[in-house]
Amino acid sequence: MSPKPWKIVSSHKDRSYRVFSLRTDRAISPRTGKEHSFFILESTSWVNIIPLTSDGKVVMVRQYRHGTGEVTLEIPGGLVEEGDTPETAAMRELVEETGYTARKVISLGDVQPNPAIQNNRCYSFLAQDVRLTREQSQDEKEDIEVVLKPLSEIPEAIRNGEITHALVLAAFYRFYMEYQPGVSIHGENQK
């Protein structure tokens, strides 16, 4: 028997925080008929963007992430704010975090960050021929260093653990599947 959606019998928001809310659902399993509790992190969707310069460099950001207590190498990204489209949010995050702008972005698709406990999506984009047009405009909780990394070095940076953020890896995976089919992140080129 194929799995089916569970019937939600109750749902209530437990707490709200700046970037997410915690919700508790009670739902009935269609297979067993038993009721179970589920805890959901409700969040607005996220975006990230792979910005490429005309000379083949990826505009990346190095920043501190309090959850892991580490400084990570990532691509620009952030929240889709109310009234924004994912595309608009990606372009905004690019300019705010790096000072680079893009005239147009191309969708690389979206993923569900963790559908077991989260209700949001992460939309990834590609921007080509980005240009530095202004200074960064970081908020007071950000401390971002802009890093220009040659696109040719990205697979090795993934292999050696320099790039570890799962949503950044998903964006690069989509990019390499669509735009660089001869490049492998496993160490050998495909022919």
Tell where the protein language model's regions lie, with residue ranges.
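A short, amphipathic edge element
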Residues: 1-12
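Unchanged
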Residues: 36, 45-48, 53, 79-166, ...
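Long, compositionally biased
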Residues: 180-191
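A glycine-rich, hydrophobic loop/mini-helix early in the fold
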Residues: 43-74
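Acidic, metal-coordinating catalytic segment for phosphate/diphosphate chemistry
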Residues: 11-48, 54
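Short glycine/serine/proline-enriched coil/turn segments at secondary-structure junctions
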Residues: 17, 67, 115-117
